[in-house]
Amino acid sequence: MLVGCVNRSNISNIQLISYDDSSITVDADAAQPEYGAIYHLLFRGLPNSNQTVPIISTSEEQTKQQFPAYFKTFIDNKRYQTFITSSTKNSNGSRRIVINTKALKQDLEQNSIIRKFGY
């Protein structure tokens, strides 16, 4: 299933490949595929996966305003890449990306961006 979204003025197509309790594997076709994949998980969710709803339930704008220091480091300093287990180029130019969702959620919990168990 392909999912499109606009992020950082780029259109990102994300195709779910597989998932388990601690990771999600996607193919992403965008100028910044790793960022696009993380963005989808955080603010959009991935249909037909174990993460169909966004990890962060509040709006992107509201969350970034509430936690500016965290997101400056996370996005501008590319800290999100620490949650990418693997990123390899496919023959069609897209990238196959494995995201450690367990570590990502734990980091968001430790920094009070989300609460444990979504409450």
Predicted regions and their residues:
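Domain-level marker for long, solvent-exposed, non-transmembrane regions
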Residues: 5-119
